[in-house]
Amino acid sequence: MTQNTEPQSPAHTRVIVGMSGGVDSSVAAWLLKDQGYQVEGLFMKNWDEDDGTEYCTAMTDLADAQAVADAIGIKLHTASFAAEYWDRVFEHFLSEYSAGRTPNPDILCNKEVKFRAFLDYAVTLGADYIATGHYTRQRPLNDGSGKAQLLKGLDPNKDQSYFLHAVSGERIARTLFPVGELEKPEVRRIAEEQGFVTHDKKDSTGICFIGERKFTDFLKQYLPAQPGNIETPDGTVIGKHQGLMYHTIGQRQGLGIGGLAEFGDEPWYVAEKDLKRNVLIAVQGKHHPLLFSRGLVSGPVDWVAGEPPAQKFRCKAKTRYRQPDQDCEVTVIDGGVKVVFDDAQRAVTPGQSVVFYQGEVCLGGGVIEQTWRDNEALPARLEHQASEGSDT
């Protein structure tokens, strides 16, 4: 898929905008049309609603997207990527939860559906580029590689580069991000000024296929409960859980272990999952040492540029969305990276992603597999590599 990463004149450039029925993609489409591009919209259906529930909002979202397309004066296509979503995203989502990890399906959805299935389909419709309403930016490399850098959005409160880190530089180069140059209040102002029905629409939260449902209720439809004990680090049983998959590291709510007089009033937090024993380890106090990790090991890393900047380098990282950038040292190892943070990090969660930055440039990221604390032995995987490296 070779393509000049610098758009030709807008009048000769055809862009298909992924329109979700939300305010951000509405304004993205309007901005491009206002700039003179040949613009069409496409509404993606990524989840099969025929599951007997009332929680999906696809029909309402489609109606809103159509109303905005009509207001702008552009054609709106519709396409179903539900099969791709199930095969490439949802089955992995269930597999990770059943293994006791906490995945982020939005990241995989962007990689496999929004910037793969959608982009490939848009090309068949004659698109030169796609566009989305993500708060991020891209910068063509202009080095003949056909790639672009992924940059943070200008609005620090809305920057979504964390969720797009797994998209390749080639596909980033084929995408325009009009609202990445704006702050959210300005986007809403434009939508209201244009009379879009989406101007005051609530931002979507959570995972698209769950909607407003309680997460545990949704998960129970697909994964059977596996009850077990909740214990303190010294092995004292203080409660029961219905399944490790329903809990995440650092979680406070939903443990059902309040009112234990002998332990005082400090709240309890999930510190660890003992997968072999099916035990949830809980500690008291938001700043308990067992909630903090000095480092982590990731699985394979998706580098936006296709390769890491070096075998060992310093940069900043996030282990969750909207976390302030954290200083760290990254070492490339077999099958992933080792990350050592300058400051211990709270509630680093296997299954979530660690994403790397140098300035405004998002380098890429990978899924967190293991963590270790201060004064704790390195994971065996790292000890093995360290012993091999000591001979050099």
UniProtKB/Swiss-Prot annotation:
Entry EC number(s): 2.8.1.13
Q: Where is this region: Interaction with tRNA?
A: 158-160, 320-321
Query: Where does this polypeptide localize?
Result: Cytoplasm
Task: Tell me which residues are marked as the site Interaction with tRNA.
Answer: H134, Q352
Q: List this protein's GO terms for biological process.
A: tRNA wobble position uridine thiolation
Cite the entry's keywords alphabetically.
Answer: ATP-binding, Cytoplasm, Disulfide bond, Nucleotide-binding, RNA-binding, Transferase, tRNA processing, tRNA-binding
UniProt: ATP binding residues: G18, M19, S20, G21, G22, V23, D24, S25, M44, G133
Query: Which principal EC class is assigned to this enzyme?
Result: transferase
Catalysed reaction(s) here are: S-sulfanyl-L-cysteinyl-[protein] + uridine(34) in tRNA + AH2 + ATP = 2-thiouridine(34) in tRNA + L-cysteinyl-[protein] + A + AMP + diphosphate + H(+)
Q: Name one GO cellular component term.
A: cytoplasm
Disulfide links within the chain = C109-C208
Q: Which InterPro entries does this chain map to?
A: MnmA-like (IPR004506), MnmA-like_C (IPR046885), MnmA-like_central (IPR046884), MnmA-like_central_sf (IPR023382), Rossmann-like_a/b/a_fold (IPR014729)
Give the Gene Ontology MF terms in alphabetical order.
ATP binding; tRNA binding; tRNA-uridine 2-sulfurtransferase activity
Task: Name the segments for region: Interaction with target base in tRNA.
Answer: 104-106
**Where do the catalytic residues lie?**
C109, C208
Family recorded in the similarity comment: Belongs to the MnmA/TRMU family.
Q: What does this protein do?
A: Catalyzes the 2-thiolation of uridine at the wobble position (U34) of tRNA, leading to the formation of s(2)U34.
Q: What name has this protein been given in UniProt?
A: tRNA-specific 2-thiouridylase MnmA
Q: Which organism is it from?
A: Marinobacter nauticus (strain ATCC 700491 / DSM 11845 / VT8) (Marinobacter aquaeolei)
